[in-house]
Each structure stands twice: as C-alpha cells, then as structure tokens.
Amino acid sequence: MKRQALTLIPLLGAAAAQSGPYGQCGGNDWSGATTCVSGYVCVYQNEWYSQCVPGTATSSSTTLTTTTSATTRTTTTTTSTTSVPSSTNFPSASGLNFTIDGVTDYFAGSNSYWISMLTNDADVDLVLDHIASSGHKILRIWGFNDVNTEPSTGQVWFQKHQGGVSTINTGQYGLQRLDAVVSSAEKRGIKLIINFVNNWDDYGGMSAYLNAYGGSTKTDWYTSATIQAAYRTYIKAVIDRFIDSPAIFAWELANEPRCNGCDTSILYDWIADTSAYIKSLDPLHMVCIGDEGFGLDEGSDGSYPFSYNEGLDFAANLAIDTIDFGTFHLYPGSWGVSYDWGNLWAITHGAACATAGKPCLFEEYGAPSDHCAIEVPWQTTAVSSTGIAGDLFWQWGDTLSTGQTHNDGNTIYYGSDEYTCMVTEHMERIAAR
C-alpha cells in the first residue's frame, strides 16, 4: 500500500552458457553456468553461492558511497564482506507456520510505513509499547526512503540518487532512524519486516532510481545493471547494520513489486537473483518478496488479481529456494472485486502455500470504511485456512507527540472501537483456536 536505483540484467537461465551481470555462477547444488558474460567475473560468496560482479579475474571490488550528514565519504570494499550473523534464535518458517522466540503458532501484526520516518525516539517507543501490549508480534515497516535531491535539514532520507551516484545517509536523519526502531523492537520482542524499495512513488520508489540512472519503465528498473548495483549496495548497507538483530523477522525485496505487461520471467529472475544475494549476506534471517499475490491458477475465478498481467506468477515465485514464505495483499476496492471475494483470495493463497510446503503471510489488507464488518471475516478466514500462518492489517494508527498519525482511510487507531474488533478480539480468536 502507500501509493500516491543499482541496475540489473536478468539471469540468462540455468541452461545458458554464461551467467549475466550479478547472476549466480556457482555454489553447492548449482547446475547452471559457471562463467560470466564479458566484463564480469565469478566471485565466491560462500559455499552455496558465487556471483557475477563487474571486473576481471584479478578484480572483485565495488565502490560504495555513504554519508553521515552533509559529508560524503567514498570507500572501496571487497564484494560481500558482511559477516555471518552470530545468533540462530531468529524467527523462522516451521512447516506451514512461523516460529518466534521458540513458539510455533499463528501470529498477528500490522503495518507502519511511517514509524521509520519519526524523529522522536519517545514516539517510536510509545508506538511499540502499544503494539507489544496488543499481543501483536510482527510489524512491517519501510526500510527505504529514496530521494533525488537532498531534503532540508531535519528531513529523513535514507538514500540519494543524483548524478549517477548513490549516497547512503547513515546520519541522524538517515539510517539512525531505522536504528531507533530496531533497538526499540528488540527491547519489546517485536519482530520487523524491513523492505528495501517501493514499487510506488511514495518515498521515492523505483522512480527515484530511474530518474538518476536512466530508464523509464519497470522493466528497465528490474533489468538495468546500474540500478540493481545501487539497489544491492543499499541492501548490503541495511543488512550490515542489523545482521545480528533478533528483531528482524524477514528482509523483503520490495513493497508490492509489479511489472505490468511483462513476461513473468522478468520478475522471477529478479526475485531469484536478489533473494540469493540477500541469503549470501545473511543466511539466517528469512527473505520474502512483498508482492500482492497476483498470478495464480489454483482456485482462480478469472478475475484480474488472479491474472498474470502484472508480471507475477505467485506459485513459481514461491517455489524459489531462497524465498522462505509467501506474501499476499488484499484491496478489493482498488481491484474491482467485492469485499466477500476477499475470502476466496485468502483461501486460494493458503492452499498454494500448503502445496509449496511454505507458510503464507496475509501481509496487507484494508478497506476505506466499515472495517469491522468487512475485515473481521477476512481475519477469521485467514486463521482457519491451512497454509496461512499470520496476518498484518494495513495500517496501525496512534497518537504521537505531534498528534494522530496519517489516516489513509484504512487506519486502525490504537484504543478505538475498531481496534477492539480488529486487534483485541482477533487476538482472542487466535488464542481460542
């Protein structure tokens, strides 16, 4: 939801003679190409993953740019220097369920795109106190905030794309805001889904990359080597900060990735390649896509969301080894279907996940009004559906030091009557199963 750049070439496929830029070129059980196209060299990442990166056989370094405030610093770092996380007590997929802190169950939660943009730590703590008191265990947040020009002092931004250069802001109004959220979540036992880019233009999105590095379409974004290099530089910067954190539920590729009119191979290759890259940096935390669940034959009624028009194949993407669980969203009002239809959407995705042997997370759902009457039946269906292991409504609302958080029509405010039906009573239904 919330709608209002490295560049990557798609993988050439396991049967190709050479792997493309940033493609996999080796690893345990790898049966594909073991050499790279011209200008790229196969570099060992770990025992199960080697990758084609720019350079020759004698060079395997990339240039990263970071900033702590107004000062830009350029450093050269060997590819994939991220250390393996030291803890194994991280959230995980257990059959068709999730395990959190040793408990395997169905888990509820919510979304808060805005919490990582807050500049008052007390507000962050307040919100997470309320979430912890609700019984929720999972919170999905924005891990991106892309800009093309540096905002005025005091404005939060995470990555600037300008003049063909990616600058990562690690300062007070940069990734230190994510630090505050992760630290607060750790203290309260909340687990975070952190995503890396937005399909939509809010907070920059993929358009910020295209503006800086060239291209005009989503296909360009997914297949540009320059854009994907910047994207991966950012991924690594975030993972490096939180690789040992027990508060990370999963790393998420994007918010609602789409490629309208594209062959499904475009997104499939990007998902496979990017998720493998993330696993090479952090093999212990889970990885998910963040998609809406489009492109599914099983149980389809022929409506638009089941089609492959947005370039997604839910079952094929879910089957990728380096994707730990499925995600799907639900917005009937935006998709031209009825609210009751939402129950079919949930059931069919649960069934697809059960077939794949992986859990599904009902990651976003919302309606602009009548939340209890419309959304509680979706929650009830999700809890009773095999293959669905948790749900996160869109979105959490609260009252901060500056007033109420943004109400996009879908917002459920802490302590409201709708909070009672959507959160308190939902947690009771989960406990009573």
UniProtKB/Swiss-Prot annotation:
The keyword Cell inner membrane does not apply. Keywords: Carbohydrate metabolism, Glycoprotein, Glycosidase, Hydrolase, Secreted, Signal. Its EC number is 3.2.1.78. InterPro entries: CBD_sf, Cellulose-bd_dom_fun, Glyco_hydro_5, Glycoside_hydrolase_SF, MAN-like. It is found in: Secreted. Residues 20-53 form the CBM1 domain. The active site is at 256 (proton donor), 364 (nucleophile). One of its GO terms (cellular component) is extracellular region. It catalyses: Random hydrolysis of (1->4)-beta-D-mannosidic linkages in mannans, galactomannans and glucomannans. It is an enzyme of class 3 (hydrolase). Belongs to the glycosyl hydrolase 5 (cellulase A) family. This is Probable mannan endo-1,4-beta-mannosidase F.
